[in-house]
Amino acid sequence: MSKYFNKHYWIRKLFVNNFFSKFVNQKLLNKIVFNSIYKSNHWNKSKKFDQSQSYSGPGSAANSIQTNNLINELEKFFKENRIKNILDAPCGDCAWIKRIFENNIEYTGIDIVKDLINKNKEIFKSNKNVNFYCKDLVEYNKFDNFDFILMRDFFIHLPLPL
């Protein structure tokens, strides 16, 4: 089906429009846009989800060279610096970082998309070191509780100009 008949396409277009965004609370705007991106599986061009892809976009694919290199470096850094608890914000669908969960690290993921957080809670419910919360990172203020804060894809989602 053409993207022009996709309701999520129009929701994003409407709310990202600079004119309209002046009249909408920024917190509500972020929620609407990112929920729409998740529900439409916007980042996954094939529109089919499998374990090698991610609802969070192509940069979050679990088996890419870029992702494997990053995970290897993070594991090394965590070990060398005795990192015991991390905050991942926004966490997305955790497709790329779940290997970290095997390293006895307390992991907290936050994301603005409630359905995504609920799905993560279901998928990782057997892992007692993993917690997820639906929070808007722009308003989150409990950073002192973590040894390391990962904000891999946060800055590219900020509206410009800041």
Roles of regions detected by a PLM:
Residues 157-162:
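A short, conserved alpha-helix within the catalytic core of class I
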